[in-house]
């Protein structure tokens, strides 16, 4: 039995899709365990980009099983659109399995998301307006609708009516907005359910059987540790648990069956939306990194905030997710800089701290303490081994590993699959 979890260690957009796609080559089952279509991942195959939001990266391997786990919140409309997109691109989806326990996102969740965000004014949290938070709210409040319910016409109608009665009171009384009509949702979304029903099953059974048979299972996280609702920069977080521990809840697989955790990070840092970002750059260096790194959100299209690599963030992620291996991406983006910086600690009111504070007020006062390293000018996009990197780039990679306290198992020098270099196989192959 071998299982590997892939988690983002920063604020998402670290290149998890690419690394998952890369590791999928040796996996037999690939599963997502949290989030929804608020997270996008881009996979490049033979120079062609595929952008997915719900379906696991393993879908491009027809001989492997791809799983949408129970911890996800699924917009049936988005899922059907994504399936249609893959079919149009000639990608088969017969290997997809969808948990009957996953909750669904409906139009009233999206409307509530938008109204709540607009009402916050300057205190907005930067939601993607995809209805993710309200769907997880319904799940926690025990009024959510699951995929199993969506497939039963009578149950779906009953629960939809009950939810709309509550939501429409909220829309009309609190937000002074128009109600959502039952007829605008029911037929359309029941039809979506019928389109996906052949994929729906108890995915916990599939995953545990695979592990018990010694098959290699890869768990694919969305967002990143710093967006985790418990361990991230609350309240500027997502509504689920991207940390590795979220696997057990979101997939129905026990913690004793998890072997390795691969933390994915960039050689710098990026963030979409509001919230603390101690190493953020506002100068020409930041603009250069944004443009060279094409730092625009897959889901929102918004320019990402960028900054230097933050080892304080990374050590926090290592600790709360139990990271055993590191995958360092986008080293090539830093090529051409005379000096590259790594944040090694924070200065908080004149005191050096090595941990990431929970208090937003303290974070506002934190100043990064940097270590400067000499940069490199060479084009490294064709490098295929650590030894072939320029000395300064090689030293940068080693210093990142030292500061985080985790060995690097892969590093990448570009977006393509063949630009990912293995230092150590996490599968033990």
UniProtKB/Swiss-Prot annotation:
Q: Which residues form a coiled coil?
A: none
Q: Which residues are noted in the entry as GTP-binding?
A: 12-18, 40-42, 304, 330-332, 412-414
Q: Which annotated residues bind Mg(2+)?
A: 13, 40
What Gene Ontology terms describe what this protein does at the molecular function level? adenylosuccinate synthase activity; GTP binding; magnesium ion binding
Q: Which Gene3D superfamilies match?
A: Adenylosuccinate Synthetase, subunit A, domain 1, Adenylosuccinate Synthetase, subunit A, domain 2, Adenylosuccinate Synthetase, subunit A, domain 3
Predominant location of this chain? Answer: cytoplasm
From the UniProt record, list the reaction(s) this protein catalyses: IMP + L-aspartate + GTP = N(6)-(1,2-dicarboxyethyl)-AMP + GDP + phosphate + 2 H(+)
Which PROSITE patterns does this one have? ADENYLOSUCCIN_SYN_1, ADENYLOSUCCIN_SYN_2
Q: Which cofactor does it need?
A: Mg(2+)
> What are the EC numbers?
6.3.4.4
Q: In which pathway does it act?
A: Purine metabolism; AMP biosynthesis via de novo pathway; AMP from IMP: step 1/2
Active site located where?
Answer: 13, 41
Q: Which note does the record give on the cofactor?
A: Binds 1 Mg(2+) ion per subunit.
UniProt entry tagged with the keyword Ubl conjugation: no
- Job of this protein: Plays an important role in the de novo pathway of purine nucleotide biosynthesis. Catalyzes the first committed step in the biosynthesis of AMP from IMP.
In Swiss-Prot or TrEMBL terms, this protein is called Adenylosuccinate synthetase
Q: Which organism is it from?
A: Streptococcus mutans serotype c (strain ATCC 700610 / UA159)
Q: What is the lineage of its organism?
A: Bacteria, Bacillati, Bacillota, Bacilli, Lactobacillales
What gene is it encoded by?
Answer: purA
């Amino acid at each position: 039995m071998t299982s590997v979890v892939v988690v983002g260690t920063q604020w998402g957009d670290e290149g998890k899709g690419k690394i998952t796609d890369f590791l999928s080559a040796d996996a037999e089952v690939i599963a997502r365990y949290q989030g929804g279509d608020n997270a996008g991942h881009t996979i490049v195959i033979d120079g062609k980009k595929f952008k997915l939001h719900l379906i696991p990266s393993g879908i491009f391997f027809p001989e492997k099983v791809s799983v949408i786990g129970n911890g996800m919140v699924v917009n049936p409309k988005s899922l059907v659109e994504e399936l249609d997109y893959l079919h149009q691109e000639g990608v088969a989806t017969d290997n997809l399995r969808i948990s009957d326990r996953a909750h669904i996102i409906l139009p009233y969740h999206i409307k509530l998301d938008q109204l709540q965000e607009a009402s916050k004014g300057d205190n907005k949290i930067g939601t993607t307006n995809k209805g993710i938070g309200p769907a997880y709210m319904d799940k926690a409040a025990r009024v959510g609708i699951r995929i199993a319910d969506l497939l039963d016409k009578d149950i779906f109608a009953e629960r939809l009516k009950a939810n709309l009665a509550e939501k429409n009171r909220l829309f009309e009384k609190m937000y002074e907005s128009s109600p959502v009509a039952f007829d605008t949702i029911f037929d359309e979304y029941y039809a979506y359910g019928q389109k996906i029903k052949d994929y729906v099953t108890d995915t916990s059974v599939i995953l545990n059987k695979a592990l018990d048979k010694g098959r290699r299972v890869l768990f694919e996280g969305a967002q990143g540790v710093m967006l985790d609702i418990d361990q991230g920069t609350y309240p500027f977080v997502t509504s689920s648990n991207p940390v590795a521990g979220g696997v057990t809840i979101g997939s129905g697989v026990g913690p004793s069956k998890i072997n390795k955790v691969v933390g994915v990070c960039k050689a710098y840092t990026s963030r979409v939306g509001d919230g603390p970002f101690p190493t953020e750059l506002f100068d020409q260096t930041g603009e250069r990194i944004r443009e060279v790194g094409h730092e625009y959100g897959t889901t929102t299209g918004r320019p990402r905030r960028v900054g230097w690599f933050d080892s304080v963030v990374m050590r926090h992620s290592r600790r709360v997710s139990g990271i055993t291996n590191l995958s360092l991406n986008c080293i090539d983006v830093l090529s051409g800089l005379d000096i590259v910086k790594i944040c090694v600690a924070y200065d908080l009111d004149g005191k050096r701290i090595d941990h990431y504070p929970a208090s937003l007020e303290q974070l506002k006062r934190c100043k990064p303490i940097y270590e400067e390293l000499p940069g490199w000018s060479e084009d490294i996009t064709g490098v295929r081994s650590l030894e072939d990197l320029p000395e300064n780039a090689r030293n940068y990679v080693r210093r990142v590993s030292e500061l985080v306290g985790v060995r690097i198992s892969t590093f990448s020098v570009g977006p393509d699959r063949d630009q990912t270099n293995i230092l150590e196989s996490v599968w033990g192959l």
